[in-house]
C-alpha cells in the first residue's frame, strides 16, 4: 500500500469516527456489540484453547486410540456427506427439472426430517434394524448387528439429506433457463448440456451443501451415540472424556481437534467459490421461457428414486409414531397414550425446550437483524471484524461451543452453570449466523434511500431501525424466528454439556431414554417435539396470514 492509499484509508476512518461521535447512541450500540462478542465468543473460545496442557495435545496426536477416533470421524462424515449430497441433488433435480407427478408431496416429505431431532433417524434405525429390530428380527428373523459405521452412515444420510436438498434446490430453482436454452439451440443436449451448463451453475449450491452437511455430520452427537456402537467419533469421545473419564483437558483437546476439519471444509468451500465464477451475465431473464426438462424415461427414473426415498422417510417417522402410541410395537398394537403422558405431559423437559427455544429464536433473530443493519448500513471501523464474528459460529461444532461455554462461565462474576441462561446463550450463539445472513439478504433487497430519507428528516439510527427497517423485514424476521426455533427444539450437541437436572431438554431426554432402552417413551418425546414445532409454525402462519411457508422450496 503506497502513502496515497494509506492517507485515503486514514481519512476514511477519521470521517467514520466523526459520524459516530455525532450520534452517541449508535457509537454506544456498536461498542456494546463488540463487548458482547468479546465476552460471549472470543473469551469462551480462548478459554477452551488454554485448558489443555502440552501433554494433552501430544497425547491426542500420538495415542493410537485417538488417531483411530479422528480417522473414524473424517471417514464417516465424508461418506455420509457424499451420500446426502448425491441424494439431495437427485431429489432437487427431479423436483425442479422434470415434469414428474407428486412434486408437492415430495417437497413436503423431504422437509419432514428437519422438524424432528436428527437423532430420530438413529432411533428409527434401532427400532427397524437393531438387534431386536422389527425388520431384521421380527420379520426376517436375522441375527445381524448393524451398529457401527454402516448404521451411522444410514442414520446420518437420512438425517442430513434435507439440508442438502434445501440448499441445492434453492440454487437450481434460481438458475435462469436462458443459458440452457442457448446451449440447446447450439446443439448441446442430454448429458453434455447437463454437465457443461446446469451442473456448473449448480456448483455454488453443491459447495454450500457440502459445507452444511459436512459440518453437521462432523459435529453430530446423537446418531453416533445411539447407533455408532464401538465406532467412536470425536464428538462422542470428547463427551466420554469429560463425563466418563473426568478428563476435562482431553475433552477440550478433542473438541478443538473437531474444529480443524470443519474449518478446513469452510475455507475450502469459500476458496473454491471465490476462485471460480458462476454468475450468468445474460442480464435479466426473458419472460415466458420454459426450462429445459428431462425426457420421459429420465423423468420416471427420477420419480422412482424420489418415491422410494420419500417412502423411506415416511417409514422412519411412521415407526417412531407407532412406537409412541402402541402398547408394544410388533406384538400388541393397542392404542395407548401412556408413553406420551410419561415423556411429554408429565415431564417438564418439553416446557423447558419450548421456553429455551422461543428465547433463543427471539434473541438470535433480533440481534441478527441489528447486526445486519450495522454492518450493511453503517460505516464504522471494525465492520469486517463484526461480520466475521457474527458468522464464526456456523463453522464450529456444537460440542465445541457447549464445552467452551461451560468452561468460560463455570465460575466468576458470570457464573451460569446449570441455569437456563447458559442453555439459551449456547443455542443463540449457534443460531446467530442464520438470523444474521437472513437479515443481510433481506436488507439487500431494500432501497437504502428510504433510510436516508428518515435520517434527513431528523430520525436517529435506532428510530430508523425501529420504524423503517424492522417493519420492512417482517418476512425475513419471521423465517429466521421459525427456523431458529425449529433448530433449537431439535438441538443436541450444543447443549449436551449445558443441561442440568433442573434444566433438562427434550432432545437430550430422547437420547437418554433410548440409551436406557425406553424406546417407546423416547419415541413419544420425539413426536412431542414435532407437534410443538408444527403448532408453533401454525400460530406464526396464522399471525402473518399465510405470508410464510417453509415448504415453498
Locations of regions flagged by a protein language model:
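Glycine-rich helix-loop "coupling/hinge" segments at transmembrane-helix boundaries
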Residues: 221-245, 332, 492-519, 553
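Helix-loop-helix hairpin linking two adjacent transmembrane segments in secondary transporters
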Residues: 236-261
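Transmembrane alpha-helical segments of polytopic membrane transport and secretion proteins
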Residues: 1-32, 270-308, 541-553
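A short amphipathic helical element positioned immediately N-terminal to and/or at the very start
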Residues: 14-20, 55-62, 335-344
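Membrane-water interface segments at the C-terminal ends of transmembrane alpha-helices
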Residues: 21-55, 64-173, 199-222, 253-270, ...
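Juxtamembrane inter-helical linkers in multi-pass membrane proteins
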Residues: 189, 276-292, 329-343
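Short glycine/proline-centered loop/turn elements that form peptide/ligand docking sites
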Residues: 175-178, 446-450
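The alpha-helix within a helix-turn-helix
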Residues: 183-184, 454
Amino acid at each position: 500500500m503506497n502513502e496515497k492509499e494509506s492517507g485515503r484509508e486514514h481519512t476514511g476512518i477519521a470521517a467514520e469516527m466523526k459520524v459516530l461521535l455525532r450520534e452517541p447512541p449508535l457509537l454506544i450500540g456498536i461498542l456494546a456489540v463488540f463487548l458482547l462478542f468479546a465476552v460471549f465468543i472470543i473469551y469462551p473460545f480462548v478459554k477452551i484453547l488454554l485448558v489443555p496442557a502440552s501433554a494433552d495435545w501430544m497425547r491426542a496426536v500420538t495415542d493410537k486410540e485417538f488417531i483411530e477416533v479422528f480417522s473414524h470421524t473424517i471417514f464417516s462424515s465424508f461418506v455420509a456427506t457424499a451420500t446426502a449430497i448425491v441424494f439431495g441433488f437427485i431429489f432437487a433435480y427431479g423436483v425442479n427439472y422434470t415434469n414428474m407427478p407428486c412434486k408437492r408431496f415430495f417437497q413436503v416429505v423431504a422437509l419432514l426430517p428437519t422438524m424432528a431431532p436428527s437423532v430420530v433417524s438413529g432411533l428409527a434405525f434401532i427400532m427397524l434394524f437393531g438387534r431386536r429390530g422389527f425388520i431384521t428380527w421380527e420379520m426376517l428373523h436375522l441375527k445381524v448387528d448393524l451398529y457401527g459405521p454402516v448404521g451411522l452412515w444410514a442414520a446420518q444420510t437420512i438425517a442430513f439429506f434435507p439440508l442438502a436438498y434445501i440448499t441445492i434446490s434453492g440454487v437450481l430453482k434460481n438458475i435462469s433457463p436462458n443459458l440452457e436454452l442457448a446451449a440447446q439451440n447450439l446443439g448441446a443436449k442430454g448429458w453434455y448440456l447437463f454437465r457443461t451448463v446446469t451442473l456448473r451453475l449448480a456448483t455454488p449450491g453443491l459447495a454450500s451443501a457440502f459445507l452444511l452437511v459436512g459440518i453437521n455430520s462432523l459435529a453430530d452427537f446423537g446418531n453416533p451415540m445411539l447407533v455408532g456402537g464401538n465406532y467412536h467419533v470425536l464428538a462422542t469421545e470428547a463427551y466420554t472424556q469429560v463425563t466418563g473419564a473426568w478428563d476435562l483437558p482431553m475433552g477440550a483437546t478433542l473438541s478443538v481437534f473437531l474444529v480443524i476439519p470443519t474449518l478446513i471444509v469452510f475455507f475450502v468451500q469459500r476458496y473454491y467459490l471465490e476462485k471460480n465464477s458462476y454468475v450468468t451475465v445474460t442480464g435479466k431473464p426473458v419472460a415466458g421461457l420454459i426450462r429445459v426438462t428431462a425426457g420421459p424415461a429420465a423423468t420416471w427414473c427420477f420419480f422412482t428414486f424420489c418415491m422410494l426415498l420419500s417412502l423411506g422417510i415416511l417409514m422412519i417417522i411412521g415407526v417412531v409414531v407407532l412406537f409412541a402410541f402402541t402398547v408394544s410395537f410388533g406384538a400388541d398394537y393397542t392404542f395407548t397414550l401412556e408413553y406420551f403422558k410419561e415423556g411429554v405431559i408429565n415431564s417438564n423437559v418439553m416446557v423447558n425446550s419450548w421456553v429455551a427455544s422461543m428465547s433463543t429464536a427471539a434473541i438470535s433473530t433480533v440481534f441478527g437483524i441489528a447486526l445486519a443493519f450495522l454492518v450493511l448500513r453503517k460505516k464504522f471501523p471494525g465492520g469486517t471484524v463484526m461480520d466475521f464474528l457474527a458468522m464464526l459460529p456456523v463453522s464450529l461444532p456444537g460440542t465445541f461451543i457447549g464445552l467452551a461455554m461451560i468452561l468460560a462461565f463455570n465460575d466468576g462474576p458470570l457464573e451460569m452453570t446449570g441455569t437456563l441462561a447458559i442453555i439459551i446463550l449456547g443455542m443463540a450463539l449457534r443460531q446467530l449466523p442464520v438470523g444474521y445472513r437472513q437479515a443481510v439478504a433481506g436488507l439487500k433487497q431494500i432501497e437504502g434511500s428510504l433510510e436516508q430519507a428518515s435520517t434527513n428528516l431528523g430520525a436517529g439510527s435506532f428510530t430508523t431501525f425501529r420504524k423503517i427497517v424492522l417493519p420492512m423485514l417482517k418476512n425475513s424476521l419471521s423465517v429466521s424466528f421459525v427456523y431458529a426455533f425449529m433448530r433449537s427444539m431439535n438441538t443436541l450437541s450444543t447443549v449436551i454439556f449445558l443441561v442440568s437436572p433442573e434444566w433438562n431438554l427434550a432432545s437430550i431426554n430422547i437420547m437418554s431414554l433410548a440409551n436406557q432402552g425406553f424406546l417407546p417413551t423416547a419415541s413419544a418425546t420425539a413426536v412431542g417435539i414435532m407437534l410443538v414445532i408444527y403448532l408453533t409454525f401454525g400460530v406464526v402462519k396464522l399471525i402473518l396470514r399465510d405470508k410464510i411457508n417453509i415448504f415453498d422450496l
